[in-house]
């Protein structure tokens, strides 16, 4: 349930993260930036797709100009890519890609995204 007391285990974990977690954080940011760069390289050659580079998240928004398909999520799923359709967030003709995964997944997804964009 909900309590107004701090959990001792949580406090210890928080203290450890602030004392010794900076290297892990920096490594994670570098890793995520590499994933982002891979995705941006896959998208940059398609005039119908405009990525919005995130400032503080691992979610890449991509605006799709004049898509032939109304349901972007099902279109990308046909190519084996799980995205969120922006319509769910009030952003019609946009997709959201979560790039917080391993590099191998991003490499595979990038190729599939390119195929999906070609046929969009």
Regions found by a protein language model. Give the residues of each.
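Preference for bulky hydrophobic residues occupying beta-strand positions
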Residues: 43, 62, 97-99
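Short alpha-helical functional segments enriched in proximate histidine and acidic residues
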Residues: 39-42, 116
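Acidic-histidine catalytic/liganding microenvironments
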Residues: 46
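PLP-dependent enzyme catalytic core of the Aspartate aminotransferase-like
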Residues: 74-84, 89-120
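Alpha-helical elements of Rossmann-like donor-binding domains used by nucleotide-donor carbohydrate transfer enzymes
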Residues: 12-16, 31, 38, 71, ...
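Conserved glycine-rich beta-strand-loop-beta hairpin in the small C-terminal domain of fold type I
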Residues: 8-11, 15, 24, 31-40, ...
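Active-site PLP-lysine loop of aminotransferase-like
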Residues: 1-7, 87-88
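Residue-level recognition of strand-loop junctions within catalytic nucleotide-signaling folds
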Residues: 19, 63-65, 100-102
């Amino acid at each position: 349930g909900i309590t107004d007391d701090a959990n001792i285990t949580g406090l210890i974990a928080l203290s450890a993260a602030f004392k010794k977690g900076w290297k892990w954080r920096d490594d994670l940011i570098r890793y995520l930036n590499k994933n982002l760069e891979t995705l941006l390289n896959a998208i940059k050659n398609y005039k119908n797709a405009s990525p919005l580079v995130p400032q503080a998240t691992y979610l890449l928004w991509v605006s799709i100009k004049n898509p032939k398909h109304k349901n972007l999520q099902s279109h990308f799923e046909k190519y084996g890519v799980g995205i969120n359709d922006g319509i769910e967030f009030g952003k019609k003709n946009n997709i959201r890609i979560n790039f917080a995964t391993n590099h191998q997944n991003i490499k595979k997804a990038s190729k599939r995204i390119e195929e999906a964009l070609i046929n969009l």
